[in-house]
A protein has these predicted regions:
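Feature recognizes metal-dependent phosphohydrolase scaffolds
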Residues: 1-640
């Protein structure tokens, strides 16, 4: 019998408020036991979106081809390839497909009826994997009752029930509600196909659609995010870290995406443009290639960046980045800089009017005023703040879930396979302890905005021992030296060592994961498929799913991105070809072509009981059994 002063008694008393009778407890235990024996929900893994909104949206809508697989399985030869393609496109883009159907004058009542019935067949098939309660919660609220009724039509029902359901369909069409129901069913199908989305970092930069991606993610039903270095950069910028802000500007200048700053986030660059034009020399009319890129805007941003980075590096000797203090090593007489190789390298420009050779990292008064204004612009953008708050609420440095360990970049390592130590505000940390520190310091930066934590946001973006970066980034060399041999960026030993299954096992063990099973899932480093690289490494223990969403990387990677599907039947890696356009999908059913690589095939279907959710459910059942015992023994009274 439980003592009334016991903590467990207090917990059971609270639990009894939710389940006040034995019957209520019985019902919940039966429900939870049933859930344990359902197939696990399908998990969808994506990484390194880099602002490619249309490609991201299509893969989100087609669920990496899983929607088409279900349509093929359900209808087989009953429908032609064109009919199945039309149905899939309707599921992907219901509003756009309906608008096109009207333009083509095919949106007749009979067309609506056929499409509604086909969508219902797909939705019924998918809903059989879940409890009715979960399906009801997934149905758009406005039509929950009617769609729930339609989903539970069975071929063996009596004629009265069949006529009842036929009458519902007829009423939908008579009241011109067909479009709303088609859109609602299409959304429901996509929610039932994918139970949960894992986004393994790097939403921002390169492509111009990061703001749209964030808006869409904020509407998604279930997801988590593992922060990438580009995400952490924007998080630092939104918190007001000056070097992060200038780096964001540099990245968007490089890819021609200032619209995301000015139009999406309302950040004015007018003062920066004016400052650059009056301070720096214009590009020479005969300039080509590398030097043609050194516009006044580029030169202004570069100098601001290297001054601000230099200040951070000098504040933090523990970052061990003194080799990046190159602005002060410029020989203005010869227009050269001496790098670590001890040799002078010719600079593509000698236009440094605001750099004081005696104090190279000090901002001029005009530069300081400009930086202060940019900090104000970034920290006062409401739209950006909402996006960053969402990144914090759904994101983390890493996630251990369902036998998988997810993080964007690396766990810093030494050449001998041990975890590399990093001085973290006076304490040396390594492995999981270090990633936990990085997670906390990132949250502190947003919460407290103190200089130390903000400077760490910059380090997490660029540092050699940053788990989100893991390489020696050579921004200065890439900005000023027209010699690709100077641009080589050494990588953390992690990226080579994790080709070894034993190293992957050691990393999994460090994070409390079971040995000999599961996977490490990374993004960050594009898989050069065209050069023979493979995303499945270390005998399947490491999966690298950055296949190059960014269109600029397609020639290097040979594909347009990898995604991962983990279902009750095992894992599948999807290699996607480039996305053509939404218009091509609508007019020609031009879906993304994807190759599937099956691995970790389940000998028996994986059920909810085999997942982390299953562990939680069994704990709930144990608590409910204790509550039931308390009712039976009289320790707690029922409240009918």
């Amino acid at each position: 019998m439980i003592a009334r002063a016991d903590q467990s008694f207090k917990y059971l008393r609270l639990l009894s408020e939710q389940f006040p009778t034995q019957q209520a407890v019985f019902t919940e235990i039966i429900n939870l036991q049933a859930i344990l024996n359902l197939p696990k929900g399908t998990e969808h893994f994506m990484s390194d979106l880099h602002g490619e909104y249309e490609a991201f949206l299509h893969i989100l809508n087609n669920c990496s081809g899983v929607v088409r697989e279900h349509v093929d399985d359900i209808f087989g030869d009953e429908l032609s390839e064109e009919e199945k393609g039309d149905l899939c496109t309707l599921i992907y883009y219901p509003h756009e497909k309906l608008a096109l159907a009207h333009l083509q004058h095919i949106a007749t009542p009979s067309w609506y009826k056929v499409m509604l019935e086909r969508l219902l067949v797909v939705a019924r098939s998918l809903s059989s994997r879940y409890t009715r309660s979960k399906v009801r919660k997934a149905i758009p609220r406005d039509y929950a009752y009617i769609i729930d009724e339609l989903l539970h039509t069975h071929p063996d029902e009596n004629n009265y029930r069949v006529r009842y359901h036929e009458r519902i369909i007829a009423s939908i069409l008579e009241t011109d509600a067909g479009e709303d129901f088609i859109c609602s069913l299409s959304d429901l199908i996509k929610r039932l196909v994918i139970d949960h989305l894992h986004l393994v970092g790097d939403i921002f930069d390169r492509g111009g659609g990061a703001s749209k991606i964030m808006d869409r993610l904020m509407e998604y039903h279930s997801l988590d995010i593992q922060w990438g270095n580009h995400d952490l950069l924007w998080m630092g910028a939104a918190a007001g870290q000056p070097a992060c802000i200038i780096t964001v500007l540099r990245n968007n200048l490089r890819y021609g995406n200032f619209e995301i700053l000015e139009n999406d986030y309302g950040i004015s660059l007018r003062e920066l443009v004016a400052f650059a034009e009056r301070t720096y020399q214009p590009v020479a009319p005969n300039a080509t290639g590398f030097t043609a890129k050194l516009t006044p805007m580029a030169k202004a941003i570069n100098v601001l960046l290297f001054k601000l980075e230099g200040q951070v590096i000098m504040r933090h000797p523990d970052f061990d980045m003194e080799d990046r203090l190159l602005l002060g090593k410029i020989d203005r007489d010869y227009g050269t800089v001496v790098l670590d190789d001890g040799l002078p390298h010719k600079l593509a420009t000698n236009d440094f009017p605001t750099v004081d050779p005696g104090h190279p990292y000090e901002l001029t008064d005009e530069e300081q005023a400009l930086v202060d204004r940019l900090v104000e612009e970034f920290t006062s953008s409401g739209h950006l703040r909402r996006h960053i708050e969402f990144l914090y609420s759904r994101g983390s440095m890493y996630l251990a879930r369902n036998r998988n360990l997810l993080f964007h970049g690396c766990v810093p390592m030494n050449e001998d396979g041990t975890f590399s130590s990093m001085s973290c505000l006076g304490t040396w940390r390594s492995g999981r302890d270090y990633l936990d520190f990085c997670d906390e310091i990132a949250r502190r930066a947003w919460r407290e905005r103190d200089e130390d934590s903000l400077d760490w946001m910059w380090y997490l973006w660029i540092g050699m021992k940053s788990p989100a970066s893991g390489r020696l980034v050579k921004t200065f060399e890439r900005s000023y030296i027209d010699d690709p041999s100077c641009w080589v960026e050494p990588m953390d030993p992690y990226f080579e060592l994790t080709k070894d299954e034993a190293i992957c096992d050691a990393i999994m063990a460090e994070f409390g994961m079971p040995s000999g099973s599961g996977h490490i899932v990374n993004g960050h480093t594009p898989v050069h498929t065209a050069e023979g690289e493979r995303p499945i490494r270390a005998n399947g223990r490491l999966l690298v799913i950055d296949g190059g969403f960014c269109s600029a990387y397609h020639p290097k990677t040979g594909i347009a991105g990898y995604t991962l599907i983990s279902s009750s039947r095992g894992c599948r890696l999807k290699a996607h070809q480039a996305f053509e356009s939404v218009e091509a999908v609508l007019t020609r059913n031009a879906d993304i072509v994807s190759e599937t690589d099956r691995f970790d095939v389940a000998e028996r279907r994986r059920m909810v009981s085999d997942t982390d959710t299953g562990v939680q459910i069994r704990e709930q059942i144990s608590d409910l059994r204790a509550l039931l015992e308390a009712y039976r023994t009289g320790t707690l009274e029922e409240r009918p």
